């Protein structure tokens, strides 16, 4: 109603408390690259002069290496037929004929291929191949069909 307020009508008080408040920001960040790096780092093995990635079979880049012992005497043709048969059966196979068989095994081990199949002269005679398992380096002589069946499991 027309009253005027002056300084006597007002009261100003400054209050300070001893509690400090720090703002928090949580930004969890991870991507596939970090997960993949951890997977590869934990799977890397070194034994004497041999180095390999010990990935589980279902995460390895290829299921099978098909390698002829040499590229003559029809071994490469037989290996290419087996390679095609493996692909027809849904096996993710890799064909390699460069260098010695030991070097091919080493390359396959380094990229994590679980099984390696060697086609040699005995393959031409009786239809068997040498199947090698990556981690144990165990080798067995089996028929092509049994080898492909074992790889598919």
Regions found by a protein language model. Give the residues of each.
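NTP/phosphate- and nucleic-acid-binding module
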Residues: 1-153
């Amino acid at each position: 109603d027309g009253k005027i307020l002056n300084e006597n009508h007002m009261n100003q008080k400054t209050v300070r408390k001893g509690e400090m408040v720090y703002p928090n920001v949580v930004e969890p960040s991870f991507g596939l690259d970090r997960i993949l790096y951890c997977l590869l780092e934990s799977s890397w093995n070194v034994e004497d002069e041999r180095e390999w990635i010990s990935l589980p079979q279902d995460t390895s880049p290829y299921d099978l290496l098909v390698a002829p012992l040499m590229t003559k005497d029809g071994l490469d043709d037989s290996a290419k037929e087996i390679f095609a048969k493996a692909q027809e059966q849904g096996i993710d196979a890799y064909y390699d004929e460069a260098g010695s068989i030991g070097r091919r095994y080493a390359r396959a081990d380094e990229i994590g291929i679980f099984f390696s199949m060697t086609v040699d002269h005995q393959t031409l005679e009786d239809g068997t191949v040498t199947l090698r398992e990556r981690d144990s380096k165990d080798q067995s002589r089996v028929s092509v069909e049994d080898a492909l069946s074992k790889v598919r499991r």
